[in-house]
């Protein structure tokens, strides 16, 4: 029985990519800088001491990161018996965003430029917002700027609740984000507004519209909920997910995977919010999975809760929790199953600003007869998609080189 489990540690980069300078990210290193902060006692909020990831280390994380950067992350070495194949990958895609990373690892790199709203203030063209407001029957909106999702709630959340006007904002990514209160504005109203925005944004080549619902009574207790929804454009060609689905296989999305691929190539969608619930749901879907199935989970909290918020200790806590549960996953795998752990970009919590960082990502592979040892540097995330295609005996992808026989 052949099954693939993909655990996407959203934003868990392992060192600056070869083209990081073009993004202002030279020297970024999500894993390395978290490990350094932990070793120096600077990440002791809710945890203590050096970063402890024994199970990820067994799968080859420390060695993959060393191959990427030239040195071990602090607190890690070669004193672990490695049971998996490990490597690191550079990105071909033009951006350091979520869709680009996910699509590329499924065999479809983004070789064109996304559209962006580059102005930090008055970010959106009036022609665009006028069309959205007219179709939605709204008199105006708040925001119109680059912002951190939590900071803008503190700044504009109360005004939004009293005025009924949605909050429009963006970032360095190709995104149009809309924040609205679930109770005063209404969740379905927010989703309808996002669908309108998605349609009106088509000429602008924007990768995603993101619904950012929140609850609370004021700045002190505003909190985003798990009802986020991404409205992505479709990948420009068929991914390995599409190819497996067309060949009669199953592709199970856990968390926001289906949204990222615009629901293309997905046969089953499982909603879960938070690291614990996402891990629980992944285990349950693996238990249920039959032959020729991909179970694909995005562990978004690493990025949304800790990377963007530059919360080093929180990121470390989350990694240690994830690591503590890996034995549960390994125990479910048959000898033919293939486990893949990777990331879609970096989001170094020690870096300036609040945006993603252009980094290499780990490629950790276990099972399916793979011998423990180095996979080396992969020239594209697409090597993962090509390997999945090879594993399932599918038609080869246009991009990528397989590391699975």
Curated annotation (Swiss-Prot):
Pathway listed: Carbohydrate degradation; 2-deoxy-D-ribose 1-phosphate degradation; D-glyceraldehyde 3-phosphate and acetaldehyde from 2-deoxy-alpha-D-ribose 1-phosphate: step 1/2
Subcellular location: Cytoplasm
EC number(s) recorded for this UniProt protein: 5.4.2.7
Keywords associated with the record: Cytoplasm, Isomerase, Manganese, Metal-binding
Binding site residues for Mn(2+) 1: 10, 344-345
Cofactor details (free text): Binds 2 manganese ions.
Predominant localisation class: cytoplasm
Known catalytic reactions: 2-deoxy-alpha-D-ribose 1-phosphate = 2-deoxy-D-ribose 5-phosphate; alpha-D-ribose 1-phosphate = D-ribose 5-phosphate
UniProt GO molecular function: magnesium ion binding; manganese ion binding; phosphopentomutase activity
GO cellular component, one term: cytosol
GO biological process, one term: nucleotide metabolic process
Pfam family, one: Metalloenzyme
Domain of life assignment: Bacteria
HAMAP family in the cross-refs: Phosphopentomut
Function according to Swiss-Prot or TrEMBL: Isomerase that catalyzes the conversion of deoxy-ribose 1-phosphate (dRib-1-P) and ribose 1-phosphate (Rib-1-P) to deoxy-ribose 5-phosphate (dRib-5-P) and ribose 5-phosphate (Rib-5-P), respectively.
Family that this chain belongs to: Belongs to the phosphopentomutase family.
Name the record gives this protein: Phosphopentomutase
């Amino acid at each position: 029985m052949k099954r693939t489990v993909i655990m996407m540690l959203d934003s868990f980069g392992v060192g600056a990519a070869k083209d990081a300078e073009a993004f202002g990210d030279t020297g970024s290193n999500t894993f390395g800088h978290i490990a350094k902060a932990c070793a120096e006692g600077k990440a002791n909020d809710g945890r203590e001491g050096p970063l402890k990831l024994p199970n990820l280390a067994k799968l080859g994380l420390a060695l993959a990161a060393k191959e990427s950067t030239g040195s071990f992350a602090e607190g890690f070495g070669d004193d672990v018996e490695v049971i998996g194949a490990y490597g690191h990958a550079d990105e071909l895609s033009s951006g350091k965003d979520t869709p680009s990373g996910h699509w590329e690892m499924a065999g479809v790199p983004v070789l064109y430029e996304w559209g962006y709203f580059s102005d930090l203030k008055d970010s959106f063209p009036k022609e665009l917002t006028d069309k959205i407001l007219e179709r939605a029957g709204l008199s105006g909106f708040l925001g119109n700027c680059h912002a951190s999702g939590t900071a803008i709630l503190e700044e504009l959340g109360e005004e939004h609740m009293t005025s009924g006007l949605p909050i429009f904002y963006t970032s360095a990514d190709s995104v149009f984000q809309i924040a609205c209160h679930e109770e005063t504005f209404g969740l379905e109203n927010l989703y309808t507004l996002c669908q309108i925005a998605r349609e009106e944004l088509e000429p602008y080549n924007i990768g995603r519209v993101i619904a950012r619902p929140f609850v609370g009574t004021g700045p002190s207790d505003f909190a985003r909920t798990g009802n986020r929804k991404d409205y992505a454009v479709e990948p420009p060609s068929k991914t390995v997910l599409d190819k497996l689905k067309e060949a009669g296989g199953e592709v199970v999305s856990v968390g926001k995977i289906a949204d990222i691929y615009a629901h293309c190539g997905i046969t089953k969608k499982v909603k879960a919010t938070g690291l614990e619930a996402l891990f629980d749901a992944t285990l349950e879907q693996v238990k249920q999975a039959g032959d020729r199935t991909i179970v694909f989970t995005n562990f978004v909290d690493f990025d949304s809760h800790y990377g963007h918020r530059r919360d080093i200790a929180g990121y470390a806590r989350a990694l240690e929790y994830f690591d503590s549960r890996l034995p549960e996953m390994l125990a479910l795998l048959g000898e033919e199953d293939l486990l893949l752990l990777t990331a879609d970009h970096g989001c170094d919590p020690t870096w300036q600003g609040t945006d993603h960082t252009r980094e290499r990502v780990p490629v950790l592979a276990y099972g399916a007869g793979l011998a423990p040892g180095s996979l080396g540097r992969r020239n594209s995330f697409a090597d993962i998609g090509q390997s999945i295609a090879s594993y399932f005996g599918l038609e080869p992808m246009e991009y990528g080189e397989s590391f699975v026989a």
